[in-house]
Amino acid sequence: MGNLSVNQNKLQKRLRRLAGEAVTDFNMIEDGDKVMVCLSGGKDSYTMLDVLLYLQKVAPIRFEVVAVNMDQKQPGFPEHVLPEYLKSIGVEYHIIEKDTYSVVKEKIPEGKTTCSLCSRLRRGTLYTFADEIGATKMALGHHRDDILETFFLNMFYGGTLKAMPPKLLSDDGRNVVIRPLAYCSEADIEAYSKMKEFPIIPCNLCGSQENLQRQVVKEMLQEWERKSPGRTEIMFRALQNVVPSQLADRNLFDFKSLRIDDSATPRFVDVMSL
């Protein structure tokens, strides 16, 4: 890739800045960390690796970056693509070979979405491998749009207000998951991926259709953004400004103990005395 245009340079700086802010805001990476970057071969994980390698050079702390891909033995998976790319940029990497494809095909009826089980099997394998190589952080490539989509999916279909946190401790307490692209938009990542000409591996090799509910939510958010530019950013900001007393979760706020405080100073003006 030659010299960057003005817009390309702005794009690169914006992604690096936003990723750096997310890493700092949530203390994602600390001095001496070994960060296992989970690389699928898609635009998001390539961009995450690229940005983390830049941050590794300029950060005031020292941390290792190790790229890890899981070959799930999907038919047609181009096994040579990731090793060739990672060798070309000089990054330490591991390829985990585990035939979860056959397991998923055996368990899920034909025509049903396999993504959920496939994801769980992959996550469990990656958690175990992170332990084996002594990784202190596990980096995933989810971005701002993924987080918002998950929030609305959980609200619409699960009856819960939760999304994907930028930083997460696994249920067993053995792994810390980080999402350095949490502040970055999918549109920027897609543009950056094309600019950098990453060797993208298709995500539909297994033949499974994208989760229909997620696709509906994605299209809804895209339509909102088209009609009201900037709405996505405002909605994401809302996830960072939660006011428990204005919701209805009794576990987050003690509504039962609310009582009148006779010593409190009135907030409102007595209009009758004006």
Swiss-Prot record:
Co-factor requirement? Mg(2+); [4Fe-4S] cluster
Q: Name one GO cellular component term.
A: cytoplasm
Q: Which GO molecular function terms does the record list?
A: 4 iron, 4 sulfur cluster binding; ATP binding; magnesium ion binding; sulfurtransferase activity; tRNA binding
Q: Which domain of life is it from?
A: Bacteria
Keyword Iron-sulfur on entry = yes
Name the residues that bind [4Fe-4S] cluster.
C115, C118, C206
Main site of residence?
cytoplasm
In which pathway is this protein known to take part? tRNA modification
* Subunit details: Homodimer.
Additional comment: The thiolation reaction likely consists of two steps: a first activation step by ATP to form an adenylated intermediate of the target base of tRNA, and a second nucleophilic substitution step of the sulfur (S) atom supplied by the hydrosulfide attached to the Fe-S cluster.
Could you tell me what this protein is called?
Answer: tRNA-cytidine(32) 2-sulfurtransferase
The organism is Stutzerimonas stutzeri (strain A1501)
